[in-house]
Every structure is written in C-alpha cells, then in structure tokens.
Amino acid sequence: MTNGVVAFGEILMRLSPDGYSRFKTADRYDVYFGGAEANSAETLSQLGIDSRFVTKLPANALGDGAVTSLNRFGVDTSFIVRGGDRIGLYFLESGTAQRPAMTIYDRAGSAMAGAEASDFNWDQIFEGADWFQFSGITPALSDEMAECTLLALKKAKEKGLTTSCDLNYRSKMWAPEKAREVMGKLLPFVDYFIANDKDVLGIYDNHTWTESDPKKRAEEMEIWLTEQFGFKAATIILVVSDELKRKGTWASLYENGKFYSSPFFLADMVESVGAGDTYAGAFIAARKKGMTDQDAVNYSAATSALKFSVPGDANILNEKEVLALVNRSADDWISR
C-alpha cells in the first residue's frame, strides 16, 4: 500500500429477510457483510485510493467470508487479527411505504468487542499509510476499544498521518453522556470531522440548535464542533427533500472559516444503509485527490446519493459514475 488509508473498526455479518418480508414470517434471508469503516474502505478502493481495513475476526468460515467480502473490492486485509469466539451480527428488516426499517443487533461478545489493544501493532499497520479513519462505533464497542482507538490516534499523529472521524452515534451502544466523555478525548486528535446531523443531535443533546432549518443547523454544528475540538474541517451530510418532497442528499463543508454546500442529489430509495459511510469514504478520496473544497463536497454528496440505489452495506460504483452524476443535468437520467 502506498499513501493509503487505514480504517479501523468492526465488520458485521448482516442478515435481511428476502425483499420486504417481516422478521416474524421470513423464511429466507440475504447475507451481507458490512460496518461503518469497512464500507468506507470499500468506497475508497473503488475510487482509486489504496485502503487497509483493520479489525479482529474469528478464525472460522464466517470470518473468512468477511475477509473475502473486503478483498473483492480491493481492500487490504493483511492486518486483520484472527481470534475470538464469534463475528458480530445484525438483522435488518427493510422498510417500505409507511413502515420504517428495523434493526436488531447481536454483537455482544464478538471478536472485535473482546479485542485488546495489544492485538494491534500500529507501527506496522501504518506502514505505507498517510491517513487514519475511524468512527464513533469503534470506541463504543468496549472501554478497551476506546483506549485502543486513542492509542491509534496518538500513533497516527506521531507518524504524521492525517486523521478523520465519522461520528456514527449508536444509541443502542452507549448513552449520550458516555459518548460525549469518550469522544471528547478522541476528537482533539482528529483533523477532519464527518457526521450526519442526527448523530450530532444524538450525542450533543445538551446543546441548543436551530430546529426549523436543517441546513442552517448543519452549519451551526460545523462551527461549534470546529471551535470545540480544533478540526481542520467539519462536514455534515443530510438526507433532505426537494420542493416535490423527493428524498436526496445535501452536504455542507466548513473549512478555513468558509462554508461550501453541495447541490441536491436525488436519491431514489433502494437502501439507505451505508450512505453515510460512503460519504465519508468519498470525502477522504476527494481530499487525497486534491480537489477544491467545493468540488470535494459535491463529489462526496453525489457518491452518497448513488449508494441509495444499491442494496447491501457496500456501495458498488466507479468514479466515472460519480462524476457523471455531479456533472449531468436533472433531466439526463439515462446513460447511453
């Protein structure tokens, strides 16, 4: 790997009832592998950026399946630690019409949740890398993983790597007070902060934000968080509606005291899982490709919108498709 991105976190095996079946009547399940940092690493690789995913997986066929799922996207898995009793699971029932999606986690006691800081040799892991990415899910796994993430961040800064964090707050994993405490120790070591507004609202529920205008609220969040933690830049991705009530993505970037916002990208809903992770991966790719601030936020929001068209956790795309979406008119929806 040369000038690549190291992503650190847990990859889960996902089981989803076929189509729009309900959990209580399903007799067939589709299987996917995914996780916040893994999804970002897969996006990076497809956009031409070397990526390395670091985790701990059981030394069994299910762990092998997770590794294979990463390899097929070109992600380096050479530093995945093998051991522990089980892979984390989650179950996703797809929503439709007025019925929202439903998620059930079964990740307690997973190999990664039980991992120790000594499992990971960061001097070796960071060889050939110039960027370190994690999300708020990793330190939420256990106190040990919170400490391990802090050690990794300190080592990354010591070695001169750029660092980024996708906030990814999960209320089923920890309370806002605990999340604020732990993330408050990690975020001062972060250069680029990435989030959606709901995750910021979830953790920083003790702060007052604008309620009526999501875009204005995103900008308030970016300013406040940058002032609190000293980020080089903060960017927030939103799922919003246009004047016809169609869903789509919009993103804001705050860097060097200036705001940059993307156009609205229509996102017809096949599946939303992984859209934020895709945004994080695309944003890192844009920074590494040397794009301007405006081009970076446009590129990242477009990549996220494309994820809504793909089932499963991972986005399946190429850069040509992303650039076509960024550049085409709203009426040009057929590639000929």
Model-derived regions: residue spans:
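Hydrophobic faces of well-ordered beta-strands that scaffold small-molecule active sites
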Residues: F53, T163-C165, F193
